Amino acid sequence: MKPYLELLQHVLDHGAEKSDRTGTGTRSVFGWQMRFDLNDGFPLVTTKKLHLRSIIHELLWFLKGDTNIGYLSDHQVRIWDEWADDNGDLGPVYGKQWRRWTGPDGVEIDQMQWLVDEIKRNPDSRRLVISAWNVGELPQMALMPCHSLFQFYVVNGKLSCQLYQRSGDIFLGVPFNIASYALLTHMVAQATGLGVGDFVHTLGDAHLYSNHFEQAREQLTRTPRALPSLRLNPEVTDLFAFRFEDIAIEGYDPHPAIKAPVAV
């Protein structure tokens, strides 16, 4: 995970001090890209322990098209709790946009199903793009999409994914985002009969919150360990049929977790 650690160090050393929506304050850079070859191991940060259950269940929740935290709460995942209303609703966030984007004529579009079908039909297409940034529905969202657009690319029988993330909380959020989209790439590849290539992560405003500086410095003192591997149930070939039990991360041996507050 050298690219991630290089980003941490660069922002600590060269980032600009900026105010932000939460009032916490950040150190930030604009425009940063990381590339991970998914054949070299699963890109899961090892210099601190990540909560795997949250990463996997959140992605399955997105793919269900769900926007209520009930499913997450049932599986002891709390990462969206701060933004939900009293009924657990978040408005038309990621799951709604991925699976039920509302077009100008009011017809709902299943972007993810279209994506799987289009990769099979036309793998050389330059239009294999999914967007969560639905301008007309942004005001109704509890949190506007941070990881807002992603594109797939097929060459030599391998599927690569590039994510554009407009805003990245480097210490807490970005490690989750890397793992989530790497996992999604593997799942889409299996559903379309392809191997995996690269995951490319492009960040707009990449920032460290001011109350994460010491945690980031502590993380940078740790020596990275070998990357784990991902094992998917080979019998699952429908992207929307994956369950938690079908996904296994093997050989994950991280350093201890480092606690840090979430900026809401």
Swiss-Prot record:
The keyword Nucleotidyltransferase does not apply. One of its GO terms (cellular component) is cytosol. One of its GO terms (molecular function) is thymidylate synthase activity. Keywords: Cytoplasm, Methyltransferase, Nucleotide biosynthesis, Transferase. Its EC number is 2.1.1.45. Its main location: cytoplasm. It holds the Pfam family Thymidylat_synt. Pathway: Pyrimidine metabolism; dTTP biosynthesis. It comes from the Bacteria. DUMP binds at R21, R126, R127, R166, S167, G168, D169, N177, H207, L208, Y209. It is an enzyme of class 2 (transferase). It is found in: Cytoplasm. It catalyses: dUMP + (6R)-5,10-methylene-5,6,7,8-tetrahydrofolate = 7,8-dihydrofolate + dTMP. The active site is at C146 (nucleophile). (6R)-5,10-methylene-5,6,7,8-tetrahydrofolate binds at H51, D169, A263. One of its GO terms (biological process) is dTTP biosynthetic process. Catalyzes the reductive methylation of 2'-deoxyuridine-5'-monophosphate (dUMP) to 2'-deoxythymidine-5'-monophosphate (dTMP) while utilizing 5,10-methylenetetrahydrofolate (mTHF) as the methyl donor and reductant in the reaction, yielding dihydrofolate (DHF) as a by-product. This enzymatic reaction provides an intracellular de novo source of dTMP, an essential precursor for DNA biosynthesis. Homodimer. HAMAP family: Thymidy_synth_bact. Belongs to the thymidylate synthase family. Bacterial-type ThyA subfamily. This is Thymidylate synthase. It comes from Xanthomonas axonopodis pv. citri (strain 306). The gene is thyA.
